[in-house]
Amino acid sequence: MIPETFFLSPEIVKAQQFGQPIVALESAVITHGLPRPYNLELACELEAIVRHENVTPATVGLIDGKVHIGMSLAELQRLASEPKTRKISRRDFGIAIASKECGGTTVAGTLIAARIAGLRVFATGGIGGVHRDAPFDVSADLEELGRSPLVVVCAGAKAILDLPATLEVLETMGVPVVGFQTDEFPAFYSIGSSLPVTARANTPAEVANIARAQWKTGINSAVLVVVPPPAEYALPAAEVEIYIRKALQEADAKSIQGAAATPFLLNRVSELSGGASLQANLALLRNNARLAALIAKELSISAEGRL
């Protein structure tokens, strides 16, 4: 039963009725992750990429206190231009719904909504994780990954985080990290981090088989599929590290903490890299959406993929 606080677009309802593949897309990247006009352009482009593979996109977000699964162009435009939107994670749903607010769902927020709506595949840029020099500052994304039976396609965790610690928490949460055509955990802007993944898959069908096997066993955690950014846009890890350290120093000097920290750090890394990190971010988002669509098609081949 879908809660009355949810609204599934007619397109999503139809896709579910006919067993057609669907890919969930987050909206925090629209409301908080990218500057205008890139945010709306990218939201539309990601949906187009998914549609190109004959898969239905389901952008998730809050409009006037309703959790939308699938959005119209007008709704995407509103989220992209609304001056005050809340960043929606697990703790924020009740507040935003009661206040009839608009909001962009984080990885955690999107996982919750997608799970309730019965979706099985989700594409994002990078997950949250354990913050550097702040081991008690752990993203809610990790816990939701541990209890959400979805395939989540990403480029690893955001490079501003403590990647080894993030992988340790994922292990604790029972989340397998599957490298797509890679044996290393990607570092978001960079191709590799020298950190090993749990397993490797070379095709979308292999990913689908892993997910089916996990869920048939009754293990309801996510399968985290990590994909390196496209090589032509990837940045050298050492170069990115210089930008991150400088951005962290500035954030500390300005006492920027909590939910404001990640947007500030990502924006400063973009400025320090002359926009190269932004272009890498856009490229990996496109790449992840395409792969997620291919995996969704493989899962939809068998009714077992729609448990």
Role assignments for model-derived ranges:
Residues 23-25, 57-62, 103, 121-126, ...:
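General beta-strand structural signal in soluble alpha/beta enzymes
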Residues 189-216:
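Anionic-ligand binding region
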Residues 219-287:
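A C-terminal functional module that forms or caps the active site or interfaces directly
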Residues 13-17, 22-23, 52, 113-116, ...:
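Solvent-exposed alpha-helices and their adjacent loops that cap or buttress functional pockets
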Residues 1-19:
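N- or domain-start disorder-to-order transition segments that initiate the globular core
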Residues 117-182, 197-200, 210:
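Phosphate/pyrophosphate-binding betaalpha-module
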Residues 27, 32-34, 40-95, 216-231, ...:
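Glycine-rich nucleotide/cofactor/substrate-binding loop typically near the N-terminus or early
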